[in-house]
Swiss-Prot record:
Function: Displays specific triacetylfusarinine C (TAFC) esterase activity but does not hydrolyze fusarinine C, which has the same core structure as TAFC. Hydrolysis optimizes but is not essential for TAFC-mediated iron uptake. Both extra- and intracellular siderophores have been shown to be crucial for the virulence. Subsequent to chelation of iron and uptake, FsC and TAFC are hydrolyzed and the iron is transferred to the metabolism or to the intracellular siderophore ferricrocin (FC) for transport and storage of iron.
Disrupted-gene phenotype: Eliminates TAFC esterase activity and causes increased intracellular accumulation of TAFC and TAFC hydrolysis products. Reduces the intracellular transfer rate of iron from TAFC to DF-FC and delays iron sensing. Causes a decreased radial growth rate under iron-depleted but not iron-replete conditions.
Induction of synthesis: Expression is induced during iron deprivation.
Protein name per the record: Siderophore triacetylfusarinine C esterase
Lineage, broadest ranks: Eukaryota, Fungi, Dikarya, Ascomycota, Pezizomycotina
Length: 292
């Protein structure tokens, strides 16, 4: 106690570093329910959610999950795993995330297209490392969350390895990237017959209403606003998401498809909405109602 400043502690959490096969380090941040006295006591089965762009979203997701303990429908929470980079003074490593979060294509730009390598790293390195830290906890289900390029990653993971996770959460996915190449994967996914009797995965897609139709800020110059509005129209964040959902509607390989537009949110502000809603539904409202 006293008035001497000290660092702000974050209970029920830890972080560590893992390297991929190329020797590149990743920051792995993990949190678990605030009411746990320790993480070694046998518990479960519990859900776990993996979140990319972890530097920007770990605290947001952790606090959102902890706040649910005061809700009437709290189901015990789950484990949050955020995957990021060793950074100081910033939240994003533009070069590394551009490679890690975009799918491989025949005409991928230089420095992009490493999603499969990154997903292999999550499955073969991150997942076992996290599970080793909770030896007495049994896992019920797993989700993958990503925003923007991360949302594109979540879609690519669903379309190419649908059994890797039980739920894929694509927040404001960059469907526009590389001439809408992800839609070719979506088409192949829809046209492939389901061969397994296991429950199909679910998909959540969301975006902010201001992403495609931004308002003008009070202090914004008209020329700047017009340029920003043109870019928003070209990216078609809402329309692309709606087109994708229409393509996937009724797909037998999906258990549920949930689409949400967050009114009055832009590409940055919508992150807190989608991560809170995504983990809340995945932790507490599972299984989702089956799509018709």
């Amino acid at each position: 106690m006293g008035d001497r400043p000290t660092p702000v502690p974050l209970p029920n959490s830890e972080q560590f570093y893992l390297e991929n096969d190329r020797g590149e380090p990743y920051l792995i941040q993990v949190s678990w329910p605030l009411h746990w006295e320790d993480k070694q006591t046998g518990r479960g089965p519990l859900p776990i959610i993996y979140i990319v762009d972890g530097n920007a979203l770990f605290l947001t997701a952790t606090e959102a999950a902890w706040r649910r303990a005061a809700a009437s429908h709290f189901a015990g929470g789950g484990i949050i795993v955020a995957i990021g980079y060793p950074l100081k003074g910033k939240l994003y490593d533009a070069r590394r995330r551009s490679f890690d979060l975009t799918p491989p294509t025949a005409c991928a730009p230089v420095g992009y297209g490493g999603a499969d390598v990154f997903l292999d790293f999550i499955e073969n390195s991150v997942r076992p490392a996290v599970q080793a830290r909770f030896p007495q906890v049994s896992l019920a289900r797993e989700a993958l969350y990503g925003h923007s390029y991360g949302g594109l990653l979540a879609l690519h993971a669903l379309f190419t390895r649908p059994q890797s996770f039980d739920c894929y959460i694509a927040s404001s996915p960059s469907i526009w990237w590389n001439s809408l190449c992800i839609l070719h994967e979506a088409k192949a996914f829809v046209e492939t017959k389901k061969v397994s009797h296991d429950q199909s995965p679910s998909l959540m897609v969301s975006w902010g209403s201001w992403e495609q139709h931004p308002p003008r800020w009070a202090d914004e110059l008209l020329d700047h606003y017009e340029a920003r509005k043109r870019t928003a129209a070209e990216l078609r964040m809402a329309d692309n998401a709606l087109d994708l959902c229409a393509m996937l509607h009724g797909c037998s390989r999906l258990h549920a498809l949930i689409k949400t537009e967050y009114e009055g949110e832009d590409h940055t502000s919508v992150m807190s909405c989608s991560v809170s809603r995504g983990l809340t539904m995945f932790f507490e409202d599972w299984p989702f109602h089956q799509s018709g």
